[in-house]
Structure formats: C-alpha cells, structure tokens
UniProtKB/Swiss-Prot annotation:
It catalyses: N-acetyl-L-glutamate 5-semialdehyde + phosphate + NADP(+) = N-acetyl-L-glutamyl 5-phosphate + NADPH + H(+). PROSITE patterns: ARGC. One of its GO terms (cellular component) is cytoplasm. It comes from Pseudomonas putida (strain GB-1). Its main location: cytoplasm. Belongs to the NAGSA dehydrogenase family. Type 1 subfamily. This is N-acetyl-gamma-glutamyl-phosphate reductase. The gene is argC.
C-alpha cells in the first residue's frame, strides 16, 4: 500500500481527494492536516466519508509524520507548499501539489501573478507539470509534481492537437471559459453566496487571470513558438464544471480535424473525443476524471471551435492528482478513477 499524507484537507479539493482515495485499492491515507480543525475526525466533518476514514482525524502539520509517508498531496492555498516541500523531498517523500506553487517555470513570473516572491525557486528545476497527456514519461520519474489548474487543463487539452500539428495560428487564440462556483474555493466570499451567484452569470478577471500565464506556458511549449491568447473566465450558477469554448484560425482547411483529434487522444484513458457535431455538457463529466472534447468548423471556414468540458474538482484538480499518483508509482493509470459521471 502507498502511504499517503494530505496537507490541507478541509477545502473542496481536499475532500474530493479523500473521496477518490477512499476508492483506491493501493492507497492508504495515514496523515491529514489542518491547523484550524486539528483533532476533528474526518468522518465528522464529512459525513459522506463515514465508513471510509473512521479513526482518521485532522492533525497539526508535523514534518516527521508527513516525511514518513510515501507521497504527500498539498491541497492548500498558494505559498504553503513552498515552505514544506523541500524538507519532504530531502527525506525522500514524493510531493504532488494541487496548488499553483510549482506550475510556472519562471519564479519572477509567478511572483508577478501571485503577489509575493516565490518561496522555493530552487525547487522549480525539479517540478514536473502534471498534465499526463503531455508529460507522462516525465511524471514517472518525478519527485515533485505540479498538478495543473482547472481552466488550464480544459484549455490545453482542447488546443493541443491543433498547435502540435502546426495547424492553428498561434498568435490569435481565444479561450472563453465558464466555471462552477466550487472553483472559487470553500472560503466565505460574497460573490459565492447563493443569492449572488444563483440565476446569474458574469465574466471576471478579464484584464488578466492567474491561470493565464500557466495556459500560455503550456500552449507555447506545444506550439514551439510564442502564442497570443485571450482568456476570459466566467462564473456560472452551477457547483461543479468547466466549459471551455476555444477559438483558433487554421492555416490549412483541408485537414480532417475530427481525425486529428481522435488520433491524438486515441490512447488517452481520460480524454473522450466525441463524434463530429457533438456538444459536450458539463453534467456528463460531473464526478468523473474525464475531459470530453468536440471540434467544429462552422460553415466550413477557417475558424475552428473546440468545446472542452471537465469537472473542475476531478480532472481539473483531485482526480488528475490521483492520475499522477498512479503514473508515479507504476500503477494502472485508471486505478481508482474508472467511475462514470453522475446523472442527472
């Protein structure tokens, strides 16, 4: 059994990680930390986990207890993993970080977007960006894995086939993305209140969202050149889900884009390229570690529209983290993640 530690288990990504690991036949959660909830039983805080984690309680973070684990997940706000990851890595413990702390390769760029100096720039050379569809082989050898964000996952998976094949004009990419309210986290905030978010939709961070440099970094690597991306996120009145509508101009209209996408993702267990003409729905991936994609070329012109949907808490966070765990420890990549989405 893989001995697992979790730092920060009281947010939505933390409880989702617990839910997924409860169904994992090769993982055992030995330590879960929370300074604010130390001493509280996991099953008391999350009744949906009763019968799965009886006897496990939140504890104050203890470096020795965490270092005794085979792998530690960080489901924390940005900056926390900076302070603890180095000590764990030195002890031989693997680290899978769900925060943004190690996603960007440039420490100065990270500081610009997150409003504070990067706390562990010396570790960036060891960090592997945990998008399995791109970095599977690097993940196998990793010590420190940076799990991609939710918007970056849906957007990159939608654009990758076009950019890798050199078919899209990389200077004019548009990502029009919608997210459920759980993407804002569990903390109390006026914008997340039911009366504020219900029956309404709005764009936000149009000037620049923290996920913009992460998406741009991945797309630039895929294209092999600089890219121009307009990324506009929206808050929608649903709990879970990301719907990304992606626009690109293709340079060769003779290419069969459906075949291109199907070939690119033919061997990917968690990317579903839907039949031509499909319109994937967020409800089809709720609770599942799947990205569903459809590609369109309206009126047969040179503008391509890619529709990409994920559950922001699963393929956009905790499910992708478990997928990385499986790859890292040489397990079947689908282990503990084969459940279907929830309907209705």
């Amino acid at each position: 059994m893989i001995k697992v530690g979790i730092v920060g288990g009281t947010g939505y990504t933390g409880v989702e990680l617990l839910r997924l690991l409860a169904q994992h036949p090769q993982a055992e959660v030995a330590v879960i930390t929370s300074r604010s909830e130390a001493g509280v039983a996991v099953a008391d805080m999350y009744p949906n986990l009763r019968g799965h984690y009886d006897g496990l309680a939140f504890s104050v973070p203890d470096s020795k207890a965490l270092a005794a684990c085979d792998v530690v997940f960080f489901a924390t706000p940005h900056g926390v993993a900076h302070a603890l990851a180095g000590e764990l890595l030195a002890a031989g413990t693997k680290v899978i970080d769900l925060s943004a702390d190690f996603r960007l390769q440039d420490a100065a760029e990270w500081g610009k977007w997150y409003g504070q100096p990067h706390g562990a720039p010396e570790l960036l050379k060891d960090a592997v960006y945990g998008l399995p569809e791109v970095n599977r082989e690097k993940i196998r050898q990793a010590r420190l894995i940076a799990v991609p964000g939710c918007y970056p996952t849906a957007t990159q998976l939608g654009f990758l086939p076009l950019l890798e094949a050199g078919l899209a004009d990389p200077s004019r990419l548009i990502a029009d993305c919608k997210s459920g309210v759980s993407g804002a986290g569990r903390g109390a905030a006026v914008g997340s209140l039911f009366c504020e978010a219900g029956e309404s939709m709005k764009a936000y961070a149009v000037k620049g969202h923290r996920h913009l440099p992460e998406i741009s970094q991945g797309l630039r690597l895929a294209a092999g050149k600089d890219i121009g991306l307009t990324f506009v996120p929206h808050l929608t009145p649903m709990i879970r889900g990301i719907h990304a509508t992606l626009y690109a101009n293709v340079v060769d209209t003779s290419v069969d884009l459906q075949a291109l996408f199907e070939k690119r993702y033919a061997d990917e267990p968690f990317v579903d390229v839907m039949p031509a003409g499909s319109h994937p729905e967020t409800r089809s991936v709720r609770g599942a570690n799947v990205c569903r994609i459809a590609v369109h070329r309206p009126q047969g012109g040179d503008l391509v529209v890619v529709l990409s949907v994920i559950d922001n808490l699963v393929k956009g966070a905790s499910g992708q983290a478990v997928q990385n765990l499986n790859i890292l420890f040489g397990l079947d990549e689908r282990m503990g993640l084969s459940h279907a989405g929830l309907l209705p």
